[in-house]
Amino acid sequence: MRTLASVVALALAAAAPPAAAADTVHYRLSATLDPAAHRITVAGTMRGPDGKEQPVSVDKVIHHPIEAQGEDYARGFAETTGTIQSEGVFLSGASDWYPRWGDALVTFDLTVTLPAGWSAISQGKRSKNGDQVRFSCEQPQEEIWLIAGQWKETTRKLEELETSALLRERDDALAAKYLDATATYIAMYSKLLGPYPYAKFALVENFWETGYGMPSFTLLGGKVIRLPFIITSSYPHEILHNWFGNGIYVDPKSGNWSEGLTAYLADHMFAEQNGGGAAYRQETLQKYADYAAHAKDFPLSEFRERHSPSTEAVGYGKSLMLFHMMRREIGDAAFVKALRTLYQEKRFSRSSFDDLKSAFATASGKNLNASFAPWVTRTGAPQLRARDVQAALHGDEWRVTGTIEQTQAEEPYTLAIPIALTLEGKDTATQTVVRTTGKETSFVLTAKEKPLRLDVDPEFDLFRVLDVEEAPPALSGAFGAEACTMILPAGVNPEVLTAYQQMANAWNEGRATPMKVVTDAELAELPQTGSVWVAGFENKFAKAAAAALEPYHASVTRTGDRAVVRVARRSKGSADVIAFVAAPHAVQLSGLARKLPHYHKYSYLAFEGDEPVNVEKGRWPVTDSPMTALFAAGDVPMAKLATRDPLAELPPAFSKERMLATVNALAAPAMKGRGQKTPELDRAAEMIASAMKDAGLEVLPADPEMKNVVGVLRGAKPEWKESSVVVGAHYDHLGMPQDAKMFPGADDNASGIAVLLELARQMAGSGKPSRTVIFVAFTGEEAGLLGSKRYVAAPSPWPANKTIGMVNLDTVGRLASGKILVLGAGSADEWIHIVNGAGYVTGAPVSAVMNDPGGSDQKTFIEAGVPAVQLFTGANADYHQPTDTPDKIDGAGLVKVAAVTRELVAYLAERDRPLTSKLGGAASKTAAAPSGERRASLGSIPDYEFPGPGVRITGTTPGSPAEKAGLKEGDVITKLGATSVATLRDLSEALKALAPGDTVDVTVLRDGQSITVPATLAAR
């Protein structure tokens, strides 16, 4: 088995630098930096392509301002051509700190003398000697970079590869996280593309916010580095640039191909790895349509760099879609072969789009002139329409006929158009490709089964201008609109009105055509054309926004202190949108002004707090795409499409197979449901203790009163010796009642134990955390949280009142296409940040649910004053049923749950201060007496993400009182008997006061009407 280090070592061994090109210039330089005086002095020699050596002498002040560039308000980065100052040094070839020889590539030996406590970074091998740093770069480069600062440096060696993190303040945990990621990404891309081309890679923290990728290092701003999603988005993108862009250089005469290719192999590939490739492409096409397609488009051959949303939509979006179409055209094997060959032959030289086309053609043996060149040289994109699509029975065979049109005014493109046909009785779709070179192409498909629907380009594989009904309305429709009006609420207090005005001003900066900004008092009606922002709950046009949102059942009414954003089409088929934005407090609006451009792909958002913090986001469903033809009445879902493997996979941190094996063992028939006080439950405890020991945990002696299984991973910081993070999951279930039906408890909660044990293995193998992490398999949860109550009450070296936070894993095995719900996120201010960060880092779908129904072991910790959450993959009809079996567990989902849990626990293990508890001083109070165990069940399946008031249900369990009473999906329970129900906990408490067999009135809201039905409760 190859280790990560050995993979990297093999890659480096094959990465010998090519001989310098004949037109390369070699520099031998000594530079001295005086940051306080903004001065650099340089002495040395340069040897030109003619072989003649010339002296170099430079003595100059360089202190150019750091200024925002272009209209890229969504990114907010500033730039400089060069600066030397006390905060740091940033010099590129454009800074003229050394003489340049035209466009010639360079090699160099550079020695930099620095003030005490300073260090420097550039290309090439790096060595230090006192206050001097030397760089030796044999690989031809486009320019010489010189960056300097006062950093705390962490370095690791992977065989011959040196990886470093240079941070302005010491942060060992952050450095370790980035160094782990560096090794992982370099190994993955070396395997995919060929050997990493340099002897080092460094993460360098800049003294202002930047996002630069240089050969062998990346220069990121301090805030950027600490954004949770950067390590799985921008960071691999910058590492990959060492192959394309900083390994093979862009021929400046041909257009910049490297950004699109890098975005495809990093950002898009990571989305593919998480099952989101089609969604990523849909968002890419929507961004092109909203920002560039109509007035700001240009050929790829003219793209040089991003400086606005429109240049990004073309230079990154259109380009990555070109590479995706090439991959679909020639196949994965030929696509990868072409990239590897290009890298091997063109490393440290300049390449063009034509070189890429030749590489793809050679690898595939195909003539790609018609399917490649037009995307580079032409402005625009095809627009598709499917018409006259019909299904008819001919004898014993069904025929589906139709015509696909290219409706753009320009010449047609050569296209391979994917089509998916959903057939009656078939789980998987029949997929084919229709090839077209003209404006119209007819097709005939045949099938034995009855066709139900046909979808054209269902996975957004073609670069094209989307029909507006193919994608949901999103903020990009407002930010990208040429004609846009922002309507402010005249009737609000002056502070809030000023904040809305400042928001409009911020968004107008850099716009080619500024938004028109007016108040609602100045208008009798909405503008007839263009997109519109309606600002403020009090705005008289809020009703118009609400009317436009009716198809999505969305509201614009104020809910507490939430800031809300909602987007709808102004009319069906219109590209113009109406965007509603409102916040109760002026302080929230400054944050929204800064943040919303980053959320351009979303249809709806909600924020809380002063910052404010995002707590809800999403895209409306697409319900009426013109690229879909239905042959049957009703809402017919598209059948499953063939799975596609990503071009490369990250090495898994967690074993799906091992977790499924744990579930199978605990839920096996021989375990008889792991009922209370049974030999089988004792056997489960022994299995768990053995697994913890094998994982490397210190397993504590069993408590004779309550058989919790406790494994400890001791922390490294002695000053935190009493502090801990608790990770919990209960291992008991309902056993085998008198009717002899076994309740396997696979999801509830063998799944939680499986994730807990896998996380223990991973964390124990990754070195000591700063704070002790305690893994607890609780018993007695089904009998009233007995095990967790015993843990909290019992004497311990890690007392409950020193626990920074608790993460509970309960019923986490049925993720599928749903979300990982994190219940109880309202128990501390920071949970929402931690949860959102975990979602960004892992790519897993997460939702922080502020309320906590209080049904599992986290409740015990919350009552003891410990901020605690439960991870949960949602209720289902098999809950507490004999049908909760191992075959229904989603192994891939367990991996995602484990990844999210690791992020939560790792953060808590390194956090240097307590969480900001929202438990109302519970830590200093005696926990309330339990209100009793719930015995009665209604059988409704709650929607845990519904914020209330009331409990919305997603369905009912078969044969349950709720089903018999006629409750159905979408109902909102507002009353049980005489008890009002505002939250899920209210419903749970109301049921505790009732018994099986009781008949109670259930009041629900259905389609805006309140109805009451009787239900006879069953045993839980």
Task: Describe the predicted segments one by one.
Residues 711, 727-785, 901:
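Alpha-helical metal-binding/catalytic segments enriched in His/Glu/Asp
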Residues 170, 177-178, 184, 768, ...:
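Metal-dependent peptidase/peptidase-like ectodomains
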Residues 661-665, 674-714:
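A non-catalytic alpha/beta surface segment that caps or lines the substrate-entry region
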Residues 909, 915-1020:
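C-terminal recognition in membrane/secretory proteostasis and scaffolding
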Residues 20-196, 328-330, 346, 382, ...:
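Acidic/His-enriched low-complexity segments
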